[in-house]
């Protein structure tokens, strides 16, 4: 019975012993995954931890994470954590001692001492910390519980400091001082401010601060002490270690094969060094590098590093094979099979690369070939062969009529960039370009092509290219390799006459002398086209938007989109009506027969514009006199020409010249073409007017009443035509005239 009773009493004891053993074994396991390892932006590695007791080694390593602002604190010493290093270092925030900074008194405000003492405390103050003082006329003192440890004095007297160069390097006493803390200091530290007798008056010496910190300061980056007072704290470095006297602390860590008799212990992954501090032993553990990295305080926390993936393995092995080993790597000669695979890989890669380049090259060749075929097709369709034949017959004029390649014009206009557009009209878009020789040109890209008129177009290009007159925009050549022909003209930079004459926002006022000079130049150009050229050429669209001005206000007639050449024995052209409202010859509109006198009528409207400064058509005028020509004829009939002369030139003009030009304009606007002067007569008469050898007699001859009634096409008339026509070719803005265009022939 006694034996049975004894056995029953031993069972609970055995269970207790087994429980202790199991607990001891379980303590060697990793902390559970539920343990939080981050607080804010600060990592909390084991042996530190947040949460339950199994998340950290012992209470000295417990970290409390403030749920409001995610700020970590070391629980036992109640200090905010800055960072944790597994190399045995933590940084905490320690308060700043201050005097005379904000309280109105010079009495120091000393914070509670830094206390890291206690049974089993692993923390101590390292010798990386400095005692720093910033301010004037005081001493900063660091003390333990019973005695002063170190101190330094800060003064604003430059005689008490070293040279300027020395002051710039360290805080050596001028406005700031610092001193290193000796090793082996107690675990309770305070920082005080001592003010000499006579300097403790309120406000005397200003703000003074003193603090411990592991940060480095010099007189260059130390500003006013108020900055440190406002900051409120400084970073202090604490060392930490394991107390080997308690097996409960040493048992859970990975590097646990240690004994008190050996100064150094290591296994294949991690090592621990032993030492003594304040009468007790400690050890510091770390992963053996460079072969391992990780956390040595966790079972299996040090993991192997694959050096073959790093520069150290690649650089050392070079042409050999890098083989990763536990804790290191080895360079071994490449095996034949392995070398064979490498060669095969290089060959396959090279073949694929060559294949890709071949496919790309073939694609570019096909694209280039297609483009070349398309360009040749367009060249033939647009009359390129005929133009070549024409140029071959006129060897002396080859340069004047050049055939440009599409590549040249694409380069000149930056691939017809929309930012290069000078203007747009019914016949096409005009771009500003620069040729390889530096010449600035206007490149007109047509919108439509009439394949039935190819031969006529080529003949006219050749004729127009031979025109060489200083008051006519020069056709430099064309490109026929595009879907629609592209014409290249000389560039005229100063815009069109319409804009300069009618734009009220323009500060420039065109004087009468300039207007008369422009009229003479236009007349001379038209006279040249009608009589002096190889074949008479009728412009068919004379208007102020087609008169361009260069930098010297020299007129240049442009836009030959609707012009036609005739043989010498021809007196007129029978065509579909083309032109612009306000400028179209009424006789031409009724008969569809365009003569040289039709250009004279349009020029007469331009003369009236120069005289009056008004636009060729306006809805402001009365219904019957909406057109400028009719309005002018009505003024002539009522003998009030002077009333409609432009106010901007009345005060400075020669009135005899004005009346003479008005008389000439009236004759140009005669309804019957036979009664109008020709352009040569107009040009000579204008020259005579300018030389003041012409007497107008002030009186302007008037035609009969029948002429007056049928002088101009009214807007009330019903025409079976559309309302779209070419705009100005080279000016930088859209046409500003109120003239409404008719539909032109489909031209180039």
Swiss-Prot record:
Its main location: membrane. PANTHER family: WALL-ASSOCIATED RECEPTOR KINASE-LIKE 2-RELATED, WALL-ASSOCIATED RECEPTOR KINASE-LIKE 21. This is Wall-associated receptor kinase-like 2. Its EC number is 2.7.11.-. Keywords: ATP-binding, Disulfide bond, Glycoprotein, Kinase, Membrane, Nucleotide-binding, Phosphoprotein, Serine/threonine-protein kinase, Signal, Transferase, Transmembrane, Transmembrane helix. Residues 1-27 form the signal peptide. It is a single-pass type I membrane protein. Serine/threonine-protein kinase that may function as a signaling receptor of extracellular matrix component. ATP binds at residues 422-430, 444. It is found in: Membrane. Pfam families: GUB_WAK_bind, PK_Tyr_Ser-Thr, WAK. Disulfide bonds join 272-285, 308-322, 317-331. The modification Phosphothreonine is found at residues 575, 580. GO terms for biological process: cell surface receptor signaling pathway; protein autophosphorylation. One of its GO terms (molecular function) is protein serine/threonine kinase activity. It catalyses: L-seryl-[protein] + ATP = O-phospho-L-seryl-[protein] + ADP + H(+); L-threonyl-[protein] + ATP = O-phospho-L-threonyl-[protein] + ADP + H(+). Residues 270-331 are annotated as: Atypical EGF-like. Residues 416-689 form the Protein kinase domain. The EGF-like region is specific to this family of proteins and seems to consist of the C-terminal of an EGF-like domain fused to the N-terminal of another one. Residues 28-341 are extracellular. Residues 363-748 are cytoplasmic. InterPro entries: EGF_Ca-bd_CS (IPR018097), Kinase-like_dom_sf (IPR011009), Prot_kinase_dom (IPR000719), Ser-Thr/Tyr_kinase_cat_dom (IPR001245), Ser/Thr_kinase_AS (IPR008271), WAK (IPR013695), WAK-like (IPR045274), WAK_GUB (IPR025287).
